[in-house]
């Protein structure tokens, strides 16, 4: 079940995290950068949002935001990796050369 909601992603470079506010709840993905790779390390989403079906729309918005730039994505967080694996055709160009998930 996909929720149809517009999700705005903000890059908080000082805290090294992508942020979004959904239904007045803060969602965070912590990251680190090396060369031209973004390592998505930790996802913090309130259970009420996960239970409400907001995880996939949030990850779609996040990966779309990253896709606009020139970085590749290394999903070290299991939930993000699972989502990318499920949608591998859509996001295969975001993975570094030679990396499979």
Residue positions per predicted region:
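Non-catalytic substrate-recognition and accessory regions of acyl/acetyltransferase enzymes
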Residues: 1-48, 65-74, 81, 98-101
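Conserved acetyl-CoA-binding loop-helix of GNAT-fold acetyltransferases
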Residues: 50-64
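Generic detector of low-complexity/intrinsically disordered segments
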Residues: 61, 96-97
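Short, compact, well-ordered microdomains
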Residues: 73-94
């Amino acid at each position: 079940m996909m929720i149809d909601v517009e999700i705005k992603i903000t890059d908080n470079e000082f805290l090294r995290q992508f942020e979004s506010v959904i239904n007045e709840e803060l969602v965070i993905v912590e990251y680190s950068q090396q060369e031209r790779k973004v390592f998505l390390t930790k996802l913090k989403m309130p259970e009420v949002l996960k239970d409400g079906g907001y995880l996939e729309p949030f990850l779609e918005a996040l990966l779309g935001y990253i896709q606009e730039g020139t970085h590749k994505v290394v999903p070290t967080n299991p939930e993000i990796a699972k989502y990318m694996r499920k949608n591998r055709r859509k996001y295969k160009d975001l993975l570094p050369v030679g990396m499979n998930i």
